[in-house]
């Protein structure tokens, strides 16, 4: 059972809810919001199936493997507990017959909702497990209940997406872009920093599009006007982070021209060191014909020019991206163009998926589907080239002294991350010496580490 137990003062009459959270960081934020509301209403969060009066499962439905994992988790919860409420992206998915997929596979579930549905989930919980008469709302921290370690947190700034990429079904499950009010985002960020968070990871389906749906409406924070726009929000978050000596990291940044305005914030002025020189930009491919079939921006030469311009302004910039190999119709020549792009762009961190048909995606209707073995071979070749590029860039860090955020302390020393490393998806820094590590620093501290070794993914160094 994959969930975080939240301590409280249980009584025999306290209703208890188990929680299973699957999927991406955006789904994790949904889980945090549901758990925060449960706690605010006086429910206890159980760490076991046996100790729970019912179980909520937050699902993922993006790719086939995630669908199966979610269905298996629902089945396990039904077997172990019997009372299950399902929410998340898979909850919005239909089966081939047109009925709700979850209800068709698991007809015994108590209720099913789609993603970002705190109100609907709470209604279902109330129906099957009435809330306590005297909830202690003031026991819930202002920052809400978080499922991440105390020193970092995800800050979701919008829901949904306006793009219609042919390989993606997210808009059909999460809808079009809906930006959160800028004052609401800033208040959450402030509460998180006050609670001890040292790193905020800004997430959404499309961070660059923040505010498009409200025409960049001006909001107010602490009496100051702030436009509902990515660059203005990043500036405000950077200013706030500087007050707490914290980091702000940007994820899911679609390569709009406005991104160019953010780079100087990473390189100079009062934001430097707080708005991290890190961009997570999902390029997906480099050949114009493949990008056209994906319905993605289709000019790799301009992308290369922008990457070079970004690095000229901010030499320490780390660029992470994701790609798809073996997309329908991709020729060997087009795949080689992708490899050339990786070599020329020298991206620091990349992930690659062998294309997999996703039920409901329009890419399934495209001609030229490739055999499984070809798709997987291209993915493996892509990662081989990407590893070579990454190892070359990582080697340049040897001998430098870098600021590291400590994530863990164990008998071998410390484990942390630099500004170039997002949690769980990027590399780590192994910190020596092991002796008296816990007396030198603690989890959530920033330490200066001299880098002594590197491979294509991780670094080694000494305090």
Swiss-Prot record:
Chief place where the protein resides: cytoplasm
Q: Which residues bind [4Fe-4S] cluster 1?
A: 24, 60, 89
Q: What chemistry does it catalyse, as a reaction equation? A: L-aspartate(89)-[ribosomal protein uS12]-hydrogen + (sulfur carrier)-SH + AH2 + 2 S-adenosyl-L-methionine = 3-methylsulfanyl-L-aspartate(89)-[ribosomal protein uS12]-hydrogen + (sulfur carrier)-H + 5'-deoxyadenosine + L-methionine + A + S-adenosyl-L-homocysteine + 2 H(+)
Occurrences of domain MTTase N-terminal (ranges): 15-130
Q: Which GO terms describe its cellular component?
A: cytosol
Q: Does the keyword 4Fe-4S apply?
A: yes
Q: What is its EC number?
A: 2.8.4.4
Which cofactors does this gene product need?
A: [4Fe-4S] cluster
The biological processes this protein is annotated with in GO are: tRNA modification
Q: Which residues form the Radical SAM core domain?
A: 147-392
Q: Which InterPro entries match?
A: Elp3/MiaA/NifB-like_rSAM (IPR006638), Methylthiotransferase (IPR005839), Methylthiotransferase_CS (IPR020612), Methylthiotransferase_N (IPR013848), Methylthiotransferase_N_sf (IPR038135), NA-bd_OB-fold (IPR012340), Ribosomal_uS12_MeSTrfase_RimO (IPR005840), rSAM (IPR007197)
| Compartment list | Cytoplasm
Q: What Pfam families does the record point to?
A: Radical_SAM, TRAM_2, UPF0004
Start and end residues of each TRAM domain: 395-463
Superkingdom: Bacteria
Q: Cofactor comment in the record?
A: Binds 2 [4Fe-4S] clusters. One cluster is coordinated with 3 cysteines and an exchangeable S-adenosyl-L-methionine.
A GO MF term: 4 iron, 4 sulfur cluster binding
Record keywords: 4Fe-4S, Cytoplasm, Iron, Iron-sulfur, Metal-binding, S-adenosyl-L-methionine, Transferase
Task: List residues binding [4Fe-4S] cluster 2.
Answer: 161, 165, 168
Top EC class per UniProt?
A: transferase
Task: Output the NCBIfam families linked to this UniProt entry.
Answer: 30S ribosomal protein S12 methylthiotransferase RimO, MiaB/RimO family radical SAM methylthiotransferase
Q: Which HAMAP family match?
A: MTTase_RimO
Q: What does this protein do?
A: Catalyzes the methylthiolation of an aspartic acid residue of ribosomal protein uS12.
Protein family per UniProt: Belongs to the methylthiotransferase family. RimO subfamily.
Q: What is this protein called?
A: Ribosomal protein uS12 methylthiotransferase RimO
